Amino acid sequence: CRCSPSFILSQGDGMQLIRDLLDTAFSDVGVFDAVCVTFELAFGATAISSVLGIFLGLLLERARFAGKKIVIRVNRTLMGVPPVVIGLGVYMLLMRRGPLGRLNMLFTVQGMILAQVLIITPIICGMTYTSLISKAPAIRTFAKTMGADSVQTERLVIRELKKELYFAVVTGFGRSISEVGAVMLVGGNIKGHTRTMTTTISLLKSQGIFAEGLTLGVLLLIMAFIIQSLADFFQK
């Protein structure tokens, strides 16, 4: 029985075995925990950024106001800002004497997620906006000729642009899972708590353990490929 104590125990033993094998293979730098933190961070930041980015992209495309071009340029600038700059800004906000110091989010996964949301959201917003301005007007014109109301029209726009929106989300996920500078600044690269696969690779490099760093990089690439393949499958 899958719910029996023996099955649960065997599952726990299996996870512990995987943990021990990974830590032994990679000089006990906490690779198993780093894998868990990496995907908790990547999925959490991507989920939040997707909701914010797509909503802001839709809002920016529909809104008409003075200074809209400036807002678009600012967003495009943020799309290319070095993550370490964002990380430094978040660090200053979350440090004990900072404006958000009372939240105690510095050197936590939650603080790292905040930093990555600020990095990823402009990317998803910009890609969403670009897709909308090129295709949304024609879709809305068609919807109006069919007698659709405003809500039905926007639903049709999102449905017709789902591939473009999916690509924007996947791009954000890729940026998240590969990020080093911001998460190292905000998270502190603490073993078992805020150390990710990319910061582990950086640590191994600084220690001169290049073979293990390269192996871990290949492992990260394989995991990202598997997740991408699963996402493509379910997207269809």
What are these regions (language model features)?
Residues G126-R140, K144-G147, V151-L156, L214-K236:
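C-terminal transmembrane helix and the adjacent membrane-cytosol boundary/short C-terminal tail
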Residues L106-T141, V157, A168-G172, S229:
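Membrane-cytosol interface at the C-terminal ends of specific transmembrane alpha-helices
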Residues T46-I54, L58, V84, L88, ...:
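Hydrophobic positions within alpha-helical transmembrane segments of bacterial inner-membrane proteins
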Residues F7-S10, G14-M15, R19-D20, I86-V117, ...:
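Membrane-interfacial helix termini and adjacent extracytoplasmic/periplasmic loops
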Residues L17-G30, M184-F233:
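Interhelical loop and adjacent transmembrane-helix boundary motif
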